[in-house]
Amino acid sequence: MELDDHNGETDSVTPISQLGYEACRDELIEVVRLLEQGGLDLDTSLKLWERGEVLAKRCEEHLAGARQRVADALAASEAEQD
């Protein structure tokens, strides 16, 4: 997705699938800040909101993966103790 910088120029945005958890979280925080600040036109606001939704989903995916890794490590540790 590209966001208009109000000069008719666009900034290229990194695909969300390529972002790690911290980068997704930080960008999501920035999206929320921009939306709460207001003053954006409707189209830009909608684009930001849509990107924020995808960022939030990606953060959840990263967290689910981390939870699974911890669960797997704990299960392996318990299996070694038996």
Curated annotation (Swiss-Prot):
Keyword hit for GTP-binding: no
GO process annotations (BP): DNA catabolic process
Annotated InterPro entries: Exonuc_VII_S (IPR003761), Exonuc_VII_ssu_sf (IPR037004)
Gene3D superfamilies: Exonuclease VII, small subunit (1.10.287.1040)
Enzyme type, top EC level: hydrolase
Catalytic reactions on record: Exonucleolytic cleavage in either 5'- to 3'- or 3'- to 5'-direction to yield nucleoside 5'-phosphates
Major location (coarse): cytoplasm
Record GO cellular component, one term: exodeoxyribonuclease VII complex
Cellular localization per UniProt: Cytoplasm
Domain of life (superkingdom): Bacteria
Keyword annotations from UniProtKB, A to Z: Cytoplasm, Exonuclease, Hydrolase, Nuclease
Database matches in SUPFAM superfamilies: XseB-like
GO molecular function: exodeoxyribonuclease VII activity
Subunit structure: Heterooligomer composed of large and small subunits.
Function noted in UniProt: Bidirectionally degrades single-stranded DNA into large acid-insoluble oligonucleotides, which are then degraded further into small acid-soluble oligonucleotides.
Family: Belongs to the XseB family.
Protein name per UniProt: Exodeoxyribonuclease 7 small subunit
Species whose genome carries this gene: Mycobacterium marinum (strain ATCC BAA-535 / M)
